[in-house]
Amino acid sequence: MGDCSSCYSNAKDGEPAYIALATNAVRSGIVAGHNACGMAIEGVGVQGSSGICIYDLKMVATGLTEAAARKAGYDACVSDFSQVQKATFVETENPEVKICVVFDGTTRRVLGAQMASTYDMSAGIHMFSLAIQEGLTIDRLALLDVFFLPHFNQPYNYYTMAAYSAVLGA
């Protein structure tokens, strides 16, 4: 229990992994506490989601990097994509967001994602964490229903464009 124990990595097909993060410690503590009190709940595994901010640069990641996926034996493929956050006609600060989605070339299952920008796009990594947890394929993400409003995002944004690029083989 906590960050001194192993957890099950959804990015590695449920294999035990040591991923020492506070969020993993909290969730395993909740599961242990409920089960100790007679309320049976099951942990759902982890993706190892994390983030860091260095000066103005925000970087977030979940699941496996390309190198980690290859080391784990996957046919690791990546889709790299860069796009400004908002519609280009919006005349406000509009930083670029860089995204890399890692997926298995055989099963097409999403294995990981990394994003970086001076814009705070950090909440977007949660969607990729859920995709890994639920075993979604890169193809399913390509046509994901996301809202659009020019002052917030693009009509076909970097999440979906990274996935769509993978579908097209770009």
Predicted feature locations:
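A conserved FAD-binding loop/helix module that cradles the flavin
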Residues: 1-66, 150-170
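Flexible, glycine-rich terminal cap/loop adjacent to redox cofactors
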Residues: 11, 56-62, 72-170
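Active-site-adjacent helical/loop segments in soluble small-molecule enzymes
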Residues: 69
